[in-house]
Amino acid sequence: MLLLVDCSSCRTPLHLPPGATRIRCAICHAFTLIAPEPRLQSHASASPFPFPNSSPAPSTFIYPPPTPSPYTHAPHAPSPFNHAPPDSYPFTHAPPASSPFNHAPPGPPPPVHGQKRAVIVGVSYKNTKDELKGCINDANCMKFMLMKRFQFPESCILMLTEEEADPMRWPTKNNITMAMHWLVLSCKPGDSLVFHFSGHGNNQMDDNGDEVDGFDETLLPVDHRTSGVIVDDEINATIVRPLPYGVKLHAIVDACHSGTVMDLPYLCRMDRLGNYEWEDHRPKTGMWKGTSGGEVFSFTGCDDDQTSADTPQLSGSAWTGAMTYAFIQAIERGHGMTYGSLLNAMRSTVHEIFDKNKGRELVEVGGADFLSTLLGLLILGASPPDEEEEVNQAPQKTQEPQLSANEAFAVYEKPFSL
């Protein structure tokens, strides 16, 4: 049975490897000592679903609902960086400076009571056949926008990329899971939360009957080949269902097959004219996929049966995810007044670049240039071909960014804000 222990410092639930005598928290970096195995087994054997009414010692908590964080760290000192926009950031009218975010000095963990909090995940799968070129740029651009446009404190943004110096902040399955727990930890009315993921996505057969189309959507961490994928059911249970009244969460997921990756009850179907209707995705089993009173809005790269592009075509030089670039571009151009205007602008941008290239464009894979489909070759969620493999694919369906939510609403009336 999978065991979870609470961090002795910040109470973030941690996956406990079998036989471990101590574990390091990916969020606050504190070490938690583990009691001898018989004591752990005695707690685990009491019930397959332990509850808070059993009170193990702080160092041996078997995951109950998290308690408020005891952080006493002072907030970050002002950053020495000038926060120039990343190279791939939309609408940089002067020669952009290189990103200051890749090797920022480590600091104390983000406080859990900030009014604005974000987890940003960019997975490049470097030096593997799954490698993507735009995901680190996506992460840096998203961080820059949240800080400059929406006043997210840098100290309240948790970055997970392979470029982080600390391996505890690499985008592994365990670290991403812990970061999601941290994101919603002790949130309170008025909090605004953001979860951004740029990387590979996929789908697999649904095993519990909660999917309308019969498939679960998944996100692929950097270690997915050894640790497995993150399934939409897990994401929903971790950052959607616990969300209390007055808390708002925005998920921006740039990955293949990501349309309903948050497992939310309603999906907004919009055509090219901007007309829309809400599609009911509530499970026929009656399983609850909504929140505990909070609001969740999810912008995703494409529909569940589509793929998302990793391409230099939108920025003109730097590689980015098409959806992330279109999302930031729409906001920078003033189209983010309402959820409907933002979604419509994003879709128009992606449609425009696809129509312009008629599904075909010169792209680069592993150092070799050749013609293939813009949205069918370097796509998030598909494995790039070997360098010597000849590619001759038919054009894919146009990528169409999606919006889903925990409740249906008037998308052209509700103001968008992070």
UniProtKB/Swiss-Prot annotation:
According to the UniProt record, what class of enzyme is this? Answer: hydrolase
Q: What are the UniProt keywords, alphabetically?
A: Hydrolase, Plant defense, Protease, Thiol protease
Q: Where are the transmembrane segments?
A: none
- One GO process term, biological-process aspect: negative regulation of programmed cell death
Concerning NCBIfam families, the annotation shows: LSD1
**Low complexity bias: start-end ranges:** 70-80
Where do Polar residues bias regions lie?
393-405
Family designation = Belongs to the peptidase C14B family.
Functional description taken from the UniProt entry: Acts as a negative regulator of oxidative stress cell death and hypersensitive cell death response mediated by immune response. Acts via indirect or direct regulation of AMC1 at postranscriptional level.
The UniProt record lists the keyword Protease: yes
Q: Where is this region: Disordered?
A: 68-113, 385-406
Known EC number: 3.4.22.-
> A Gene Ontology molecular-function term?
cysteine-type endopeptidase activity
Query: What segments bear the compositional bias annotation Pro residues?
Result: 103-112
This protein's source sits in the domain of life called Eukaryota
| Mutant phenotype after disruption | No visible phenotype under normal growth conditions, but enhancement of hypersensitive cell death response upon infection with avirulent pathogen.
Q: Tell me what this protein is called.
A: Metacaspase-2
**Residue positions of the active site:** H200, C256
Pfam families in the cross-refs: Peptidase_C14 (PF00656), zf-LSD1 (PF06943)
Q: Which PANTHER family match?
A: METACASPASE-2, METACASPASE-4
Encoding gene per record = AMC2
Q: To which species is this protein native?
A: Arabidopsis thaliana
